[in-house]
């Protein structure tokens, strides 16, 4: 009997979404792992049932519309705690994170005839303490991964190594990683070492700045438009049911993503009173998000200054929010 084919996976457990790459079954080439029918991302959200069963990703979001008290949208934000209170119950944080890892690994196994990966690489923020990294390892253990198969690496180092595989970075030179995700912004300046690895020489970040910040700015803009055009609908929207707000959140995210490629987009507000469509142009979007972008630029300049490098240092942009044109 032939031994099972070896395969490897790397998982980026994010604040809002998680992603993964694996070695393809047929070629062994490193490829992005599809995590749903429509995306290479999976929401990092989890839903805890009354019986303790934990769902992750899109199913967690769906269940959370019916009972928001049992939804944890961003388990990563609880790093540093051992327990998270969900609907009056204390739930181990490693179980919540483990549920997300399990969801990702199941999709990987489905691509590899149900076999477990030979190695698993887990990324984490540069600023995490040993205790925080141990929590990630503990979460991996809850889904049956043995410690000797797991490697951890900081997110900026992983990004720099990926960038260096595409662009030559001479030893001793620097590269900046601008990681603008759904929930956080992290900037690091790294120096290329002789052995091909990278060391972080400066880092800045904001754990409250991300794609959701921009979503909130757009929500306030929509509310202003509704109040101007239909005050009664605005009052209704402020106390709307979860399903109404979810629909609006989705429309806002879709419009934000469309503005990366088009000069305008429509945000739809659907309530029992009817539908309202609001057109937003890219110029309006840029004006609305000017403070967010300004803060991101400020942090980037601070990181470059701290590292003692100039503006000619290459910047590798990663994270979904980095795709937004500014």
Named regions from a protein language model:
Residues 101-110, 161-165, 294-305:
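Generic structural signal for well-ordered alpha-helical scaffold segments
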Residues 127, 175-176, 205-213, 239, ...:
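Alpha-helix capping and helix-loop boundary segments enriched in small/acidic/polar residues
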Residues 2-31, 166-201, 252, 257:
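Gly/Thr-rich phosphate-binding beta-strand-loop-beta motif of the actin/hexokinase/Hsp70
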Residues 17-154, 201, 210-257, 263-265:
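Phosphate-binding loop and its immediate beta->loop->alpha context
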Residues 3-4, 14-16, 26, 39-40, ...:
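Short flexible coil/turn linkers enriched for glycine and charged/polar residues
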Residues 224, 259-326:
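Helical "lid/coupling" subdomains associated with nucleotide-phosphate turnover
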Residues 14, 123-125, 153, 178, ...:
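Generic beta-strand/beta-sheet core signal
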Residues 153-161, 322:
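Short acidic loop-to-helix transition motifs that present clustered carboxylates
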């Amino acid at each position: 009997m032939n031994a099972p084919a070896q395969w490897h996976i790397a998982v980026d457990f994010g604040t809002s979404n998680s992603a993964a790459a694996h070695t393809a079954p047929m070629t062994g080439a490193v490829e992005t792992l599809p995590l749903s029918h429509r995306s290479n991302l999976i929401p990092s959200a989890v839903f805890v049932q009354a019986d303790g069963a934990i769902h992750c990703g899109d199913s967690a979001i769906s269940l959370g519309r019916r009972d928001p008290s049992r939804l944890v949208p961003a388990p990563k934000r609880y790093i540093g705690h051992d327990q998270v209170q969900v609907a009056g119950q204390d739930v181990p944080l490693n179980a919540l994170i483990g549920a997300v890892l399990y969801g990702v690994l199941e999709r990987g196994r489905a691509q590899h005839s149900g076999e477990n990966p030979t190695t698993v690489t887990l990324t984490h923020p540069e600023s995490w303490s040993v205790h925080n990294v141990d929590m990630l390892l503990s979460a991996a253990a809850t889904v049956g991964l043995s410690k000797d198969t797991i490697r951890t690496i900081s997110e900026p180092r992983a990004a720099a190594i990926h960038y260096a595989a595409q662009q030559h970075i001479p030893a001793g030179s620097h590269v900046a990683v601008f990681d603008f995700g759904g929930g956080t912004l992290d900037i690091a300046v790294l120096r290329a070492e002789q052995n091909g690895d990278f060391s972080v020489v400066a880092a800045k970040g904001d754990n409250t700045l991300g794609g959701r910040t921009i979503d909130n700015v757009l929500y306030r803009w929509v509310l202003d438009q509704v109040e101007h055009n239909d005050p009664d609908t605005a009052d209704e929207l402020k106390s709307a049911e979860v399903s109404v707000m979810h629909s609006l959140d989705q429309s806002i995210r879709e419009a934000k993503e469309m503005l990366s490629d088009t000069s305008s987009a429509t945000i739809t507000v659907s309530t029992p009173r009817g539908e309202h469509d609001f057109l937003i142009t890219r110029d309006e979007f840029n004006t609305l998000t000017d403070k967010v972008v300004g803060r991101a630029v400020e942090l980037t300049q601070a990181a470059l200054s701290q590292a003692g490098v100039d503006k000619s240092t290459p910047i590798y942009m990663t994270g979904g929010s980095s795709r937004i044109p500014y």
